[in-house]
Amino acid sequence: MGEPLHGKRILIYSHDSFGLGHLRRCRAIAHALVDNDKELSVLIISGSPIIGSFDFRSRVDFIRIPGVIKLRNGEYTTQSLRIDTEQILAMRASIIQHTAETFEPDIFIVDKEPLGLRGEVRDTLTMLKARGTPTILGLRDVMDEPALLAPEWERKNVLPALDDLYDEIWVYGLRQICDPLAGLPIPASVRRKMTYTGYLPRFPSKGAAPTDAIPFEEPYILVTTGGGGDGDTLIDWVLRAYESGESLPHPALLVLGPFMQAEMQAEFHQRVARLDRVHAITFDAHIETLLSRAVGMVAMGGYNTFCEILSFDKRAVIVPRTRPRMEQFMRASAAARYGLVSMLEDDGWRETSQMVEALRKLPTQPMPSQCVMPGLLDGFGTIRRQTSLWLQNDSGDRPRLATAGE
């Protein structure tokens, strides 16, 4: 037997098959937890190829497992290794379980996918549950349309796992805005495990953004596509608005995203080079700093982007994607009903005049703070309190805490 580990430990599994959202959310949660408890260490397991591009606080570290990408048709493929996908998935599952056995976490948090990618955390959950380790599932505010999510979860046999393998379910949002499990046959025993934490606030990065990332002296609009893997239509739409010669109130800073195809990035950079009031970068790990200095935002409306809009109280136009999931559309629609953002639907035609009008209206639309919603950004406070209760709780009983907004 090796030497016993010291201090409190939390292990986080970050689902990583597409984009940046899961990693950025897990990183933000890890930082909030260690900032609140000097005796706590957090280890993140992820297959993201760019996890090393992010800064991590003291007592937060990561293990990168072999990467797997989920294609738009729903199939999986490896990111770089020329190994059979099934072999990669088996390797990932083995690394995850061995890490949990060695790290001996006091709490295990799973992000978004209850059983992990293709069930890769099921054995780890079963092992830790048998050891008495609290297991927590973290869900974003919206998953997908019930008509799509229900058969997916039935196929994956998720509902029994929620009952048998998890002690608690955190929903990173407010019930009055979105219920991620609405329309699903969720038993009362699972509903009792759910805690709505409120959204996760974001703060300016401690590291400064590169000076050449913000070339404008005047206020600018930040345009971001998240990871960028499917953001080309939004970037094209915005660029056409600036190429039209119409008068627009502010210049635009485009963040294309690290997963946008290289050929597409090159084409966009060529178009940007011909415009005086548009600048483009591929990626900046300090996106919070760029947003904090912006007058407003145009984005696709992923979870992290929405949290940033609320946190920095920025006017925003959301252009949600509707494939392969309706998640962004559902979030943007609900937020627009409350006046937190405005939404511009992608009708497939993407008329230039529609984007011109949206950019002109952006500086005068209401700010998110003008909509008063108790508990809206209480996410980290709720998570910290729940975590502390679990770490202090030796009886195995579920700690009770008022849900954000109640």
Predicted regions span which residues?
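C-terminal amphipathic helix plus adjacent low-complexity
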Residues: 354-406
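A short, glycine/small-residue-rich beta-strand->loop->alpha-helix junction that serves as a flexible
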Residues: 14-27, 50-51, 231-232
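Short N-terminal targeting/anchoring amphipathic segment
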Residues: 96-118
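Donor-nucleotide binding loops and adjacent catalytic segments primarily
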Residues: 30, 184, 199-296, 348
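A donor-sugar binding/catalytic signature common to diverse glycosyltransferases
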Residues: 286-330
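A nucleotide-sugar donor-handling region in carbohydrate enzymes
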Residues: 139-233, 259-262
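Conserved nucleotide-sugar phosphate-binding/catalytic loop shared by glycosyltransferases and other
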Residues: 6-9, 14, 32-87, 91-93
